[in-house]
Regions:
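A beta-strand edge to alpha-helix "cap/lid" segment located at domain peripheries
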Residues: 12, 35-36, 40-111
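Amphipathic alpha-helical repeat scaffolds
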Residues: 4-9
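Short, hydrophobic/aromatic-rich segments at coil-to-beta transitions
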Residues: 1-3, 24, 65-71
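Short, well-ordered alpha-helical segments enriched in acidic and aromatic residues
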Residues: 11-30
Length: 111
């Protein structure tokens, strides 16, 4: 299975054990000013799903031997929507780094 199908399957099936397995031991997640480790990430995602988080519009941007990038819309419990862009750097066939940018879909971007 390729990287994209693996990640989509983990999200769609809420497979936390599979998530734990695919994250490299040196894994780090970076979002704005947040930096978390592998174990913290699994707990964080599990709690978010338990709180009602859902994913929509999963869209592949690029996949190659070193990275995977995609965009999605996250919907929080209560209906708050965020568009996220996710870039994963892979190491030893596992996710080594996640860099995520988030945009509030209720706010108008000024360019």
């Amino acid at each position: 299975m390729n990287k994209w199908n693996t990640i989509k399957s983990l999200i769609e099936n809420k497979d936390f054990e599979g998530l734990q397995d695919i994250l490299h031991d040196e894994y780090l997640y970076l979002r704005e000013t947040t930096l978390i480790s592998k174990d913290e990430m699994v707990s964080f995602i599990k709690k978010r799903f338990e709180d009602g988080l859902t994913f929509e519009k999963l869209e592949l941007i690029i996949e190659n031997k070193d990275l995977l990038a995609w965009r999605d819309v996250l919907i929080e419990h209560g209906g708050k929507k965020w568009e996220t862009t996710n870039v994963q750097l892979w190491k030893d066939n596992k996710v080594g780094r996640d860099v995520v940018s988030v945009r509030d879909l209720e706010k108008v971007d000024r360019i």
